């Protein structure tokens, strides 16, 4: 127990596989769940003072944590999950569940968030990755974000400063961590919004292996191609390493079917990249983030 951080939910040597969508990941030295910005600031200030590394995991959806785990502090925003509406502006804390946030927008007949109705993860992770699907993405509705800098300062970043691109935002380079974000929505019709969300969720259920642990879409879309199509053409559908395999339902996904490890994921990703490049000449670029230490 760290005396200076008394009162904060901190768990020592906690296996991260219990918190990731892939169901893999070694232990965090310290896993912290701040309830508010004050507790978050205390954790970061302590870590910086002690020269301990720290990072935020978000909801750990489009992410693989290596089997050796993560040193220092891992911070999860599960308890920082409030969502507020001010007119047509929706503000959500970083730990707010993305899918649940789209439901709140729908309940208030606000349109703009429908594209994200089936994307797993948190608001903070969605901003970080500029998450998107079915022609929509976070940058289309983003107004601003309150972020925590690596030094512990809290500041506001505009949409322009975010420099959004395909599955990219400026904070991927700066190390700033989203605390909350504001989105500009528009008045809509509840039934129309609901029908569109039902349609998109039906498509997702038909095409994606939602019944298995996975890290979501593994690769970015290569220009002029679809990653899943290239993988299928290279005869990799169902290819398995250890407990992880290329999904037969959607070859752009890798699923944990038998107590797979992070090494299984990494080995399969590397094998798919090499095989697809040899077959088509196209080198796939991972969309999923891989962090932590090997065993």
Curated annotation (Swiss-Prot):
Pathway it works in: Cell wall biogenesis; peptidoglycan biosynthesis
Family per similarity comment: Belongs to the MurB family.
Lineage, broadest ranks: Bacteria, Bacillati, Bacillota, Bacilli, Lactobacillales
Keywords assigned: Cell cycle, Cell division, Cell shape, Cell wall biogenesis/degradation, Cytoplasm, FAD, Flavoprotein, NADP, Oxidoreductase, Peptidoglycan synthesis
Domain FAD-binding PCMH-type, first and last residues per copy: 23-188
EC code: 1.3.1.98
Needed cofactors: FAD
Cellular compartments per GO CC: cytosol
SUPFAM superfamilies listed in its UniProt record: FAD-binding/transporter-associated domain-like (SSF56176), Uridine diphospho-N-Acetylenolpyruvylglucosamine reductase, MurB, C-terminal domain (SSF56194)
Enzyme class: oxidoreductase
Active site: 167, 217 (proton donor), 287
Organism: Streptococcus pyogenes serotype M1
Gene Ontology MF term list: FAD binding; UDP-N-acetylmuramate dehydrogenase activity
Residue pairs linked by disulfide bridges in the UniProt entry: none
The protein's name in its UniProt record: UDP-N-acetylenolpyruvoylglucosamine reductase
């Amino acid at each position: 127990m760290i005396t200076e951080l008394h009162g904060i939910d901190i768990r020592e040597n906690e296996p991260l596989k219990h918190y990731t969508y892939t169901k893999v990941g070694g232990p965090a030295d310290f896993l912290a769940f701040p309830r508010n910005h004050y507790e978050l600031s205390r954790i970061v200030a302590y870590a910086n003072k002690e020269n301990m590394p720290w990072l935020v995991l978000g909801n750990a959806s489009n992410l693989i944590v290596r089997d050796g785990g993560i040193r220092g502090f891992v911070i999860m925003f599960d308890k920082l999950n409030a969502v507020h509406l001010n007119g047509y502006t929706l503000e959500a804390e970083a730990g707010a569940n993305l899918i649940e946030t789209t439901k709140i927008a729908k309940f208030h007949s606000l349109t703009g968030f429908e594209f994200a109705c089936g994307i797993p993860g948190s608001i903070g992770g969605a901003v970080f990755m500029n998450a998107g699907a079915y022609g929509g993405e976070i940058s289309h509705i983003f107004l601003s974000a309150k972020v925590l800098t690596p030094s512990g300062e809290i500041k506001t970043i505009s949409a322009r400063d975010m420099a959004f691109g395909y599955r990219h935002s400026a904070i991927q380079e700066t190390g700033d961590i989203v605390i909350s974000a504001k989105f500009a929505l528009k008045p809509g019709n509840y039934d129309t919004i609901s029908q569109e969300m039902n349609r998109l969720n039906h498509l997702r259920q038909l095409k994606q292996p939602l019944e298995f642990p996975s890290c979501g879409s593994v690769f970015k879309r290569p220009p002029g191609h679809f990653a899943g199509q290239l993988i299928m053409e290279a005869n990799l559908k169902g290819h398995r390493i250890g407990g992880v395999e290329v999904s037969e339902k959607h070859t752009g996904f890798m699923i944990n079917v038998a107590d797979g490890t992070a090494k299984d994921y990494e080995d399969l990703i590397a094998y798919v990249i090499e095989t697809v490049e040899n077959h088509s000449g196209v080198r796939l670029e991972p969309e999923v983030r891989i962090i932590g230490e090997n065993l």
